[in-house]
A protein has these predicted regions:
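Short amphipathic alpha-helical segments and their helix-coil junctions
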Residues: 1-7, 111-121, 211-223, 275-281
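Glycine- and charge-enriched loop/helix tracts that form the active or gating conduit
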Residues: 1-139, 146-185, 288-302, 306-319, ...
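Hydrophobic alpha-helix feature that most strongly marks membrane-spanning transmembrane helices
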Residues: 118, 122, 142, 147, ...
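Active-site lining segments that contact anionic ligands and/or coordinate catalytic metals
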Residues: 134-138, 143, 191, 231-239, ...
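Terminal helices and disordered tails flanking the catalytic cores of nucleotide-processing hydrolases
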Residues: 204, 244-337
């Protein structure tokens, strides 16, 4: 890959060309001509003069095109990443526990994860433009551990911890993607995926209600209808699988999660409510923490297949209140719905 004519002159005309040079190098696995590379290094800090929208488009094309890990690494080596995504650049040198991450530090793990993107085909049931789905997964992969550097700590026994790094990373992703002028719904979707990316690690202990709530989540940037209704959890599964393969390599949790999700009948994650807030108001339960907690308790029991009728739900609600010594008028059992 070489600039036409004088690379300094070409990059002076439009600094975005340094990102395009890196994208072409990654896409075709071509080396960058030494003179062009020197000019890229010279203009790296000037990339900040380019509008965030144009930078976003090039970064997105790097992540969704062939060999995204090569492109991401070139951004790091050139110094461009430190300008446009300093939060990601800080992953380098953040060591991890080798039993879970034999591949190395957080940066190395992220590059390995990005290299696996090409092995993750777009979900076959996806309707619409597949590039949008690719972008969601790609940005979630690129930023899924961005919260590790600020949460890194070492215990007295020498083990490294990154407590709540997924929540920290989700918040950071909002800042990063907002800065890059991504659409609001896209930002929310990527942030949610990052916040949830560790949840399937507990799939063997996960209650049915918790799993069904996860399955019931939707992508705000896509219509929630037909075969799209489980697109969020399908994307989360792909992120989880990539994360595992880029670290210790085990897929036991992924396989179990996939099997449990596939076994759910359509609509199991969002069954009709057995009772509503109106029923609780009839008990004189005021709107507030108790009201909200009781509705959730009934819904959890329903999702765990412990309740299936309105009569049972009313009895459950009455017992729940009695156990807590709450002095409300009890509901009168109604007919089964």
């Amino acid at each position: 890959v070489r600039a036409i004519g004088d690379p300094v002159a070409r990059f002076s005309e439009d600094r975005l060309r340094i990102l395009r040079a890196i994208r072409f190098s990654a896409r075709f696995s071509f080396p960058i001509e030494p003179g062009t590379w020197e000019a890229i290094l010279r203009f790296a800090t000037a990339i900040g003069d380019v509008s965030q929208e144009r930078i976003r488009e090039e970064l997105d094309r790097i992540l969704t095109g062939p060999h995204p890990a090569e492109g991401w690494n070139l951004l790091k080596r050139s110094g461009i990443l430190a300008v446009v995504l300093p939060e990601a650049e800080r992953m380098e040198g953040v060591e991890q526990n080798p039993e879970f991450h034999p591949e190395g530090d957080v940066w190395t793990h992220t590059l390995k994860a990005l290299s696996l993107l090409e092995e993750e085909p777009v979900v076959s049931t996806l309707e619409g433009d597949p590039s949008q789905a690719s972008s969601l997964l790609a940005w979630a992969v690129a930023l899924h551990d961005v919260g590790k550097p600020p949460t890194a700590a070492i215990r007295e026994d020498g083990r490294r911890t990154f407590y709540c790094h997924e929540q920290a990373g989700a918040r950071m992703a909002v800042v990063i993607l907002t800065r890059l002028r991504f659409p609001v719904h896209f930002i929310e979707d990527v942030s949610d995926l990052i916040a949830d990316h560790m949840r399937l690690a507990a799939i063997f202990q996960m209650k049915d209600s918790t799993l069904k709530r996860l399955v019931g989540k939707t992508l705000r940037s896509w219509p929630d209808s037909g075969p799209m209704s489980r697109y969020y959890v399908n994307t989360l599964l792909r992120l989880h699988r990539i994360d595992c393969l880029a670290s210790y390599g085990g897929l036991a949790e992924y396989d179990h999660a996939r099997a449990r999700i596939d076994a759910l009948v359509p609509g199991a994650e969002k069954p009709p409510r057995l009772i509503t807030g109106r029923d609780l108001l009839g008990m004189k339960v005021p709107r507030g923490p108790v009201y909200t907690e009781l509705l959730k308790a009934v819904e959890d029991a329903q999702l765990n297949d412990e309740l299936s009728t309105r009569t049972g739900a009313l009895a459950f609600a009455s017992a729940w209140l009695r156990e807590r010594n709450l002095d409300f008028t009890e509901l009168v059992d109604g007919d089964d719905a």
